[in-house]
Design a protein with these regions (language model features):
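Phosphate- and divalent-cation-binding pockets in alpha/beta enzyme and binding domains
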Residues: 42, 83-86, 119-120
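Short, well-structured N-terminal submotif of metal-dependent ribonuclease cores
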Residues: 1-36, 49-64, 106, 115
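Short glycine/serine/threonine-enriched helix-capping/active-site loop
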Residues: 35-38, 76
Length: 126
């Protein structure tokens, strides 16, 4: 089953962080993994605010990690953006709300430690 990676899951995979659960690691090794453009947007904002640092030049680093790990990019559609308007307000984070909309539309599980995905009826792997 293909999976959509939450931003932290993608970054922790790239860093080989111990924060990433063993179950998440297993799934990310065995399944097709998608990283949404919304995660790249979130990363760019955090870089700009000084809340995140990446080794090397960010766009080159992220592109090389995507290629090296065989992850696929997921574009954001108008329909997915508009789907956010109908989501219950369980989660205020606009990045995660868009990941919810994408996961629902594409029927994907989400790799995330954030339990708020559970209330949207999405399979969460952690």
């Amino acid at each position: 089953m293909p999976v959509l990676l939450d931003t932290h899951a993608f970054l922790w995979w790239c860093e080989d962080s111990p924060e990433l659960s063993l179950k998440a690691r297993k799934v990310m090794t065995e399944e097709d993994c998608f990283v949404s453009y919304v995660s790249f947007w979130e990363i760019a904002i955090k870089l700009n605010l000084g809340k995140l640092r990446l080794p090397g030049i960010p766009d080159r680093y992220l592109a090389s990690q995507m290629s090296l790990n065989g992850f696929e990019q997921m574009e954001i559609s108008f329909r997915q953006i508009m789907r956010c308007a109908s989501l219950a307000r369980h989660h205020g984070d606009p990045f995660d709300r868009l990941l919810v909309a994408q996961a629902q539309e594409k029927e994907l599980a989400v790799v995330s430690r954030d339990a708020v995905f559970d209330v949207y009826g999405i399979k969460r792997i952690w």
